[in-house]
A protein has these predicted regions:
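Flexible, glycine/small-residue-enriched loop-and-beta-strand segment within the central core
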Residues: 1-82, 103, 108-120
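C-terminal/domain-terminus segments
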Residues: 83-98, 104
Length: 120
């Protein structure tokens, strides 16, 4: 973790080796979530406009991950995304938009594949 004090992990979570949690804003991870190796969860961002970026401005957006989420190795979650409960993020996916509960996403940018069957 870069800072560490903005990270909140639920009960029975697992975070594999080599992960980066850049927490300039809050990162919230729900219970029973599993995070594969080399996953990056990023909250630091910068303006897209070159003139504003030249002024040195930066900002952050929080990332929220629900409960019982599985994040495959090497996935990248960009600032401001939310991931719903029981979702699956495929290995190497780049998550740029919200992921609905129960959804499986993969690719760059991450796109929906199929909803997972509920185990409840």
């Amino acid at each position: 973790a870069d800072y560490g004090y903005n990270i909140s992990m639920g009960d029975h979570c697992f975070c594999n080796y080599g992960c980066v949690l850049l927490d300039v804003c809050p990162i919230r991870i729900g219970d029973m979530t599993q995070i594969g190796p080399y996953v990056q969860i990023l909250t630091a961002d910068h303006p897209r406009d070159a003139a504003t970026r030249d002024q040195g401005r930066e900002f952050g957006q929080p990332v929220e991950i629900g409960r019982n989420v599985w994040i495959g190795g090497g996935a990248i979650l960009l600032p401001g995304v939310t991931v719903g409960d029981d979702a699956v993020i495929g290995a190497g996916a780049v998550v740029t938009k919200p992921v609905a509960a129960g959804m499986t996403v993969a690719g760059n940018p991450a796109r929906p594949l199929v909803p997972r069957a509920s185990s409840h």
